[in-house]
Amino acid sequence: MQKDTLKPGEAPVRAAPHTPMMTQYHAIKAEYPDTLVFYRMGDFYEVFYADAEKASSLLDITLTKRGQSAGEPVVMAGIPFHALEGYLAKLIKLGESVAICEQVGDVATAKGPVERKVVRVVTPGTLTDTELLSDKTESILLAVHQGARNTCGLAWLSVTQGEIHLAHCANGELETWLARIAPSELLYNVDATPAFEQRLQTQRCAASARPAWQFDAALGVRRLLDQLKVASLASWHAEGLNEAHAAASALLGYAEHTQGRALPHVQGLQVVRSGELIELPPATRRNLELTQTLRGEDSPTLFSLLDTCTTGMGSRALKSWLLSPRRDRAQAASRLEAITQLRSGAQQTLRTQLKGCSDVERITARIALRQVRPRELVALQLTLQKAELLTPVDSAQIPLLTTIFEDLQPPLGCAELLGQCILDEPAALIRDGGVINHGLDAELDELRAIQTNCDGFLLDLEIREKARTGIANLRVQFNKVHGFYIEVTQGQLDKVPADYRRRQTLKNAERYITPELKTFEDKALSAQERALAREKWLYEQLLDQLQEFVPALSRLARAIAALDALCALAERSLTLNWCAPVFVKEPCIAIGQGRHPVVEARLAETGGGAFIANDCSLTGKSRMQMITGPNMGGKSTYMRQVALIVLLASVGSYVPASACRLGPIDAIHTRIGAADDVANAQSTFMLEMLEAAQILHAATPYSLVLMDEIGRGTSTFDGLALAGGIAAYLHNKAQAFTLFATHYFELTEFAAQHHGAMNVHVSAVESGSDIVFLHHIEPGPASKSYGIAVAKLAGVPAAVVNHARHALAALEAQQSQASAQVDLFAAPPEAPASGQTAIDKALASIDPDILSPREALEALYQLKKLASAA
């Protein structure tokens, strides 16, 4: 402990206080300790201290020190206010959150620092600004609450979409749910267990722990009731979901906090139950390259192939359909029905008419949140006019299209109101003025007239002053810094009248003001300020009037999105020559001449030749295919195309095949590819076994399972034994539809011993020492492995290839001499009988507590003798 060194009578030195402005800053920063605070000062947003150091590093802006506060230099960095959106985009991409602190007080009347407050908090999961959002991807905020009974509750929403989702799941299903939701930002209870928190941290999104009191189920119910303006959640079947209600409490509280206001446009609620959706685990989404390639790129993927939508709303709807197919066939059947109707020619006309439509969904959210920009309102007006002209489709027998076209009707009077209030080409921001239409408000028109007449007055004054003073090059001008002035060059200063008052001295001229010009300046500048204030007030009044249109605009947005997505699927089905799947009740996957849609498209783009189509038939009696054949022969492509066709059909799309019959499906599981997870200290083989274990626990008779080269991450015998055991489990226990590709030729015996399995192979032809891949799936096992031929094709040196051929011949000769054969698929041997052995009896007779050292040694020799005899 430090001793007091003050002398008697000496007063302690007090720390210097913060300046008034920094006192204000620290008070605001205390409310947002984990968030970068952008503090508005004039034409800049400033960041201070640790925030400044962080922003300087992330944004590559200059870090400096200015003045002192509390006896210490003020570390700071800044950005121009007009460049805010660009810097926000960078920070959001890095997972940061930013509190925007604006000047809300009047600078002219402020005593001390002008009043400031945080008007919004921009976070990765609560974005509403179109400049910060991807057209094709939702920004989703997710709250997760760990329950007490091995369950967790989830609540999520896209602030721009306006619908809350609730779900319960078992802890073991959490990764699948997280992959399905794909949140941009995740909230969890600070009291969550370390293991639970670690599972959440694996998500590549911003994650933050929130106080435990925010996860309150009763508060969540109240917030949901208030948000939806209802007295009960019964109509949504959302009662009794305590963990999800707790998550909803944190979700809504956080969303309102970041927006700085209520969310009036959020009026939808959907309870998503585990058994309603076809399960697509993270490995399936990754291996099938639904929205990202294995390299993390956006193209070529299934979504990039399908997405010919003309609007961002349509693209987002299509992606949502693709990632959340339902087990219930009603939704898929209704989409198929609509697509079939649109294929008749209507899709081409509608796609042309939809082109250029604005993002009504996001503009509507920004209207509700009072953040909408003037030019967005002009874009909305044009879209409303387009919607009125959309060509109706004969949808009398198509309920989905009937609903869509009913909702496509623009709200009455909305377009007219926007046209009446907003200029055709307004300024980008209301703060700049030049937004409100002429003739709307007499007071604004009068103030604008004063500004308009300004040029005429200045020209007239200049002519008069030239005549009065005899200064031919005299100029009457204006700038924002010094206001109005009369400029006289150095050579004419002797002619300046006595009533001129010097305003500014330049190198080659002087600037003056006269009483007449000063009077006009006061009037003109006052008119400008008053006109801007009037425009802002009128704009707020317009936003008030637009609130009543929000529900209808939300319906219109959903209708445009659905129609656009359906038209895109109709166009794809025609352009790519796809067929309509047929849904049946009996268990089956029957595909005629199926193709991998993405590979086929890439071959067409690159001139790589025609794609080789293949049939696939899996039924209740024949559920498993054992697939053999050379690497590069097309096994993985065939397996993936079957899964993609099943997925597309389940979404309600046409499929790349000549025919398709599909029974009920509850999940698509894949075990494909190999890579170490170094960050989590998991080897290739461990990851392989983890994925296999998850599949074996989850697969049912309604699941489609793809197993590609299981067991290759360990020794040959280990791998072969494991592959045989996994195949037997999938056949006997899970009874799932299974495509089982293997490089173990021994597994071709599996079909002979299991009635529900069949052998197929990808064909290839050898010509001398060369190999030609035919890519056809044919009945029966492969006649041989072509690994050495593939190695030669890959460019392995000839010496290595020749050595491998000789070694292979020797190994095959050695194998043919072995007489014993192991039955890989026999039932496990029974455990040995539990009767006591001689060793057991001897051990039972020994009491170690009473043995002398010599007796203990004798007993040990006796046990060793018994063990040798056994």
Swiss-Prot record:
Any single GO CC term annotated in Swiss-Prot or TrEMBL for this entry: cytosol
A single BP term in Gene Ontology: mismatch repair
Purpose of the protein: This protein is involved in the repair of mismatches in DNA. It is possible that it carries out the mismatch recognition step. This protein has a weak ATPase activity.
PROSITE patterns, sorted: DNA_MISMATCH_REPAIR_2 (PS00486)
Species lineage: Bacteria, Pseudomonadati, Pseudomonadota, Betaproteobacteria, Burkholderiales
Keyword Disulfide bond: no
S-S bonds: none
Binding site residues for ATP: 629-636
Coiled coil start-end: none
Keyword Ligase attached: no
NCBIfam families: mutS1, PRK05399.1
Domain of life the protein comes from: Bacteria
Gene3D superfamilies in alphabetical order: 1.10.1420.10, 6.10.140.430, DNA repair protein MutS, domain I, MutS, connector domain, P-loop containing nucleotide triphosphate hydrolases
Residues making up the signal peptide according to the UniProt record: none
Name used for this protein in its record: DNA mismatch repair protein MutS
Keywords carried by this UniProt record: ATP-binding, DNA damage, DNA repair, DNA-binding, Nucleotide-binding
Organism of derivation: Polaromonas naphthalenivorans (strain CJ2)
